[in-house]
């Protein structure tokens, strides 16, 4: 599963609408509760765990991608 697929599934939007520019500011359904769901789904999909401070800072697809890449995951 790709990063875009995880985000689109949790936020209930089209995968084609999810880009690196997508963020908590650009997707109305990406509120604080959905953010937790996004983080949990990413952890499950990629078999990793995010420290709380890092998870809180992942407020855009680009930020999430950077964190995943730092861990050697191409999503």
PLM feature segments, named:
Residues 1-40, 44-75:
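Phosphopantetheine-dependent thiolation modules in NRPS/PKS and related acyl-activating systems
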